[in-house]
Amino acid sequence: MSLPIRNVAIIAHVDHGKTTLVDALLKQSGIFREGEDVPVCVMDSNDLERERGITILSKNTAVRYQDTLINIVDTPGHADFGGEVERVLGMVDGCVLIVDANEGPMPQTRFVLKKALEKGLRPLVVVNKIDRPRADPNTAVDKVFDLFVELGADDDQCDFTTLFASGLGGFAKESLDDDSEDMKPLFEAILHHVPPPAGDPNKPLQLQVTTLDYSDYLGRIIIGRIHNGTVKAGQQAALVKEDGSIAKGKVSKLLGFEGLNRIELPEASAGYIVAIAGFADANIGETLTCPDEPQALPLIKVDEPTLQMTFSVNDSPFAGQEGKFVTSRQIRDRLNRELETNVALRVEDGESAEQFLVSGRGELHLGILIETMRREGYEFQVAQPQVIYREVNGQPCEPVEYLVLDVPEAAVGACIERLGQRRGEMQDMQTSVNGRTQLEFVIPARGLLGFRGDFIRITRGEGIMNHSFLEYRPMSGDLETRYNGVMVAFEEGVATFYAMKNAEDRGVFFITPGTKVYKGMIIGEHNRPQDIELNVCKTKQLTNHRSATGDELVQLQAPEDMNLERALEYIGPDELVEITPESIRLRKVARKKLVKR
């Protein structure tokens, strides 16, 4: 007899409405009290997730529908967090693929769908945001089918069920002509199209650790699906480690999921997704099993990192003024702690005791780690991101990205020209009736470093850019990613309006008057290829004579906002980003002789 359980993952491209759709399922399942204030994107609990509107960490929740427990896992949509996606797909028996009715499949759709198909899952396709202007659900379905075929889906997978929905509107329907006003069709589709979990509750216990959590009261908590057997609170169990060794322990707490809460369970059997406390040394991919006859499950395979960055102790003239954790030991401990839960991350010792080589899946993956550490009070500096090269069949190869741009027609020529300079190869171009053009490129990952700033300028902020890792290909030769030099502060002090106004014609500033600067700090972009030193601390010589015209109202051009993401992609090989809880500064590594003004 099959268990009254369904384990399903929600997968999609970033910003196609996964979390909003899960919100609607939660609200309509009755888990919230009447009148309870429920925030938007209730599944995004992390501050960074709410600010950026993206899911970074996978989340588990469960709802009851017609006496069936539906475990729902909301996964990240960005390939940089693929380590999360790959792990959670091993916990489920089916998935819901969400596609925007206007945009159709995008680069990250390709990534998450490829992972699901490789796992043998049969996706249930939901075309979301059908109530938006410019929505074209039928075209979106055609593009999804083409993508299934392109990714090598078998006949059963290509024969997918399609629903049309609006997560914000809170409804789903089997056809566009239906008048459904709730999510019942989606609940029914999950029950009928997602198979019940396999597994034998009478076999020895096998649970694979897919996620780690931490509680001040319980310590480390392991989360995973029971593949076989039964687990009871208080029982003895064995943890099969990565190296094959066995660590025995006791299940001190057994928790299940209900809505957004965890509830205590006396026992759970094959098919359940549970959280267990009592195993302080557990790591992701290891197997919790029976101590009498331990049987390990295959370790989880995660794609290797494609980008690396050197983290080091801040040694700028302003070092130690704003951070709480500033030493190499504190930075090392924090990075090692991140390794416990961030399965796609790698940390190695650098060239000195104060440097660490951190590898990840992309700029966003490493950028989120840096921003998280910054908010926790850490102060450090990072060097220019570098792609990780590999040798394939004796030939040096580099990571290549699949890039999709949605731009105004007027910007098409400039985008194609700039990507050509970065060794991008155009694969397709489609123009829509609304005056926008979609461009598809294959481009080396290093060709994308620093491109986002150019792209924003070329499209005047009206372009949309998405990309994901495609494969490793033979090296495509040298390329230049930045065409302008930088303006560097000549001395330590406070930037003045007078000095900045006089130097305004030299380029674009990253700072405002009143900003503290030091010798070697990058304060702007020069409008010529070479770097230049500027004295932005110079003050106006006051006299007892008034100007004939009086002091006119003079304004400076607005500075370029150099946030963390922009700073990481902007810096060159001889530059660093200085990161503190209060500031993000750019600086030169070793000061060379520059053109002086």
Curated annotation (Swiss-Prot):
Predominant place of localization: cytoplasm
Transmembrane parts of this sequence: none
Any one GO cellular component localisation term in the record: cytoplasm
Lineage top rank: taxon: Bacteria
Family: Belongs to the TRAFAC class translation factor GTPase superfamily. Classic translation factor GTPase family. BipA subfamily.
Described purpose of this protein according to its UniProt entry: A 50S ribosomal subunit assembly protein with GTPase activity, required for 50S subunit assembly at low temperatures, may also play a role in translation. Binds GTP and analogs. Binds the 70S ribosome between the 30S and 50S subunits, in a similar position as ribosome-bound EF-G; it contacts a number of ribosomal proteins, both rRNAs and the A-site tRNA.
Name the record gives this protein: Large ribosomal subunit assembly factor BipA
Classification lineage: Bacteria, Bacillati, Cyanobacteriota, Cyanophyceae, Synechococcales
